[in-house]
Amino acid sequence: MPRRTATLEDVARRGRVPADGLRRVLNRPEVVSARTREQVIRAMQALHYVPNRSAQLLAGKAAPSIGLITASVTLHAPSQIAAAIKSHASLHQLEVAIAMPAQADFVALQARLDELRAQHIRGVIVSLPLESATAERLVQDNPDMACLFLDVSPEADVCCVRFDHRDGCGACVRHLWEMGHREFGLLAGPESSVSARLRLASWREALHSLNIARSTTVFGDWSAASGWQKTFELLHLQPRISAIVVANDQMALGVLSALAQLNRSGSQAVSVTGYDDTADSLYFQPPLTTVAQDFDLLGKRAVERLIALMAAPQLRIRELLPTRLIVRQSAWPVAAAEDRQQTLAQLKALVEKL
């Protein structure tokens, strides 16, 4: 007969520690006496309790770890960043403990930092858009924790590695302008998002530099569904829009779907650009013109800079990574759309003559 797997309750009885007390021991080992810690470890060993993360920490046998506080990995960009960080951390024999707060406010973030601290983690990468004041307070209130931020404004007085939003957004706008577009729709991310506001400001700055004073702006929530919905809103607000600049690839997917549903082709065709160059964007219909952010490079730099910061907390790390415009088939010259419509009309006339 197979042996029953030992539970935490079994360990508590064997070690003569109350069940609630045992859970506190596992969650906060640094506040437990050496005698109690040894008592719990002996009970786990006697019962052949399957070592989990907490037991390893108690025994001091866990692999060195860093923390990653990130937005939901159901979104493509955060999931790719998390994968890159884990991959490069493993090259340094580091494990990555991931925390995903429901909100990006100070209280929620501090709670996640406390959980990571309880796992003996002393270095954290924060990969979600944060207000400058929130990021700065996290650093000030946690002097024992090395914090590196990936999505803060240029004004934030914290250590960061981030992409150059201004360069990428400007490249998109200039590319469309060079193809004759003058009526722009701007589909931004949530107004509460720092990165969304930075991209929107960069688009508007680029449009202003090209003497385009008017554009129509709506705000989505990063999802394809919101991209689909907001396309109808944009075209209702300004039917003459010839190009829609979108703050991420997932919303751009929704935009392309809505335009296909509206049969916006020929002289009514609307060019679309995205942002992120996620793995799927090449296979959108049509393939998406977008701004590439090298997430693998971001993961590599983030891990390297966090290791350096943990070794020398006095370092001031502020690194800006380049972006790159990827030109595909979702954006075309205004004249080209009109030419296609004329070609179709000519072909139709020829067919009717046959």
UniProtKB/Swiss-Prot annotation:
Span of domain HTH lacI-type: 6-60
GO molecular function annotation: DNA-binding transcription factor activity; transcription cis-regulatory region binding
Superkingdom of origin: Bacteria
UniProt cross-references to Pfam families, sorted A to Z: LacI, Peripla_BP_3
Keyword annotations of the record: DNA-binding, Repressor, Transcription, Transcription regulation
Record feature DNA-binding region, as residue ranges: 8-27
Complex formation: Homotetramer.
Role summary: Repressor of the lactose operon. Binds lactose as an inducer.
UniProt-recorded name of the protein: Lactose operon repressor
Species per Swiss-Prot/TrEMBL record: Klebsiella pneumoniae
Lineage per the UniProt record: Bacteria, Pseudomonadati, Pseudomonadota, Gammaproteobacteria, Enterobacterales
Gene from which the chain derives: lacI
